[in-house]
Amino acid sequence: MTEVINTNVMSLNAQRNLNASQKMMQTAIQRLSSGLRINSAKDDAAGMAISEAMTAQIRGMDQAIRNANDGISLSQTAEGAMQETTNILQRMRELALQSANSTNNSDDRQAIQQEITQLQAELDRNAQNTQFNGQRVLDGSFQNASFQVGANANQTITFSIGSIMSSAIGGIASQTGTAVSGAAATDITISLGGGAPISINSSAGFVGPDASQDATSAYAKAAAINGAGIAGLQVTAVTAGTQTVGPIGGTAGDTYNLTINGVAVFTNTELSTALSNTQLRDGINSVSSQTGVLATLNGGDITLTASDGRNISVTESGTGFTAGTDGLTVTAGPFAATLRGNLTISAINSIAIGGTVATLGLSAAIAKDTLGVNSIDVTTTAGAQAALLRIDSALTSVNSNRAAMGALQNRFDLTIANLQNVEENLSAARSRIQDADFAAETSNLTKGQILQQAGTAMLAQANSLPQSVLKLLG
C-alpha cells in the first residue's frame, strides 16, 4: 500500500459515513418529534400530494358533520314549534265540537268564538316568531334551503318547510251542488287527493223508511256516499224551496186540500175566510214529524225545508182553488213538481268523482280552496261542523310537516354516521402514508447513534494514520 500524506482516503471515507449516519439521526429525530413520516415534499413528493388531498377531504367532512348537526338543530326547532301548533289546533277542535252541540245558545257560541279568535292569533304568532339563527322557519319563507353535508361541491341536502300560518293551513275541497237528478246514483267512484278511486254502492241500497227518501233523493245519495266510509270525506243533504204563496180561500164555500209527502195537512177544510200564511205554516209544521218537512215564513214567502235531503212533494186542490195560481204550487214555483235536494260534499283533499256524476248534481273535479283556519266561525252549528273539517285538514298539514322534519332528522343522522365512517377510513389511509412508524424510526435512531459513535472513533483513527509516515523520516 502506498504511503501518502496529501490525501487521506480513509479519513474521507469515515467523514462520508459519519455524515450519512448524522443525516439518518436527523431524519429519525425529526420524524419521532413530529410523528410524521412526511415532513416536507422531499421526504415523499407523491405521498405528500396524496396525503394533502386526503387532509382536504377529512377537514371537509369534519365541517360537513357540523353542518348536518346544525340541520338537526334547525329541524328540531321547527318540529318543536309544530308540536305547539298541534296543541293549539287540538284545542280549537275541542271548541268546535263544543259549539256544534245544540245545548249551547248564541251567547255561549260567541264566547267560544272569542277563544277561537285568540287561538288563531296564537297560531300566527307561533309561526312568525319561530326562528333559527335569525331566520323564520314556519311562515313559509324557508324554501329550498341547502345544507352542505359533503366534502365536495354540490353534496347537499335541500328541503323546504311549509307555512303553518292560520291562513295557509285548513284548506278543504267543498261544493254544494245543484239539485240531484230523478235517477238513482249508480257506478259512482270517488277518490281524494289523487288516490285510488273507491266504488260507491248504488243509492238504491240506502233508501229511507219514507217514500220521499227513495233512491232518487238526495237523502239516499248522501247515505250511499257516507256509507263507503271514506276517511276525511263528508256529505250532507238538504232539500229546500221558497215560494210566494198565492191566495187560498176567502169565499163562502171554498175548501182546501194540501198533502205533503203523502201526508194530509188540510182535508176539505172550509175557508170562507182566506187562509193566512201563518196558518199555512202552522198546519204544515203540525205534521212535520210525519212529512220530514218544516215551513218558515219570510214576508209573503214560505220556505219548505227537509233537513235530511228527502224529496218534497206538494199536492193541492179544492173548491174555489185554481191550480197554478193559488196556494203553493203556482206555475214555475219550486213545488209545482217534486222538489229534490242538494248535496254538499267536503273533504280535506281534492275530490274526483267518476261515473254517473250528473245524478248527484256535483262537479267531477273539486279542488281545495285557499281558505285556512283563520276563516272558521263557530257561532252557528253549521259553522262549527264546517270548522271541524278545516281543523282536521290543518292537523293533517301540520302532521305532514312534522313527519317531514322527523324524516329529515333521521336523514341527517344517517349522513353523519356515513361521514364519520368515511372519515375514519380515510384517516387510516392517510396515516399509512403520512405518519411515522415509531418502531422503525426508533431503530433508525439507535442505528444512527451507534454509527455516529463508531464513525467518530474511526475518523480519529484515520486522521492519525499519516503520522506513521514520520517514522520513515526518522
UniProtKB/Swiss-Prot annotation:
GO CC terms, sorted: bacterial-type flagellum; extracellular region
Main location: secreted
InterPro entries: Flagellin, Flagellin_C, Flagellin_C_sub2, Flagellin_N
SUPFAM superfamilies, sorted: Phase 1 flagellin (SSF64518)
Function as written in the Swiss-Prot or TrEMBL entry: Flagellin is the subunit protein which polymerizes to form the filaments of bacterial flagella.
Similarity field: Belongs to the bacterial flagellin family.
Name of this protein: Flagellin
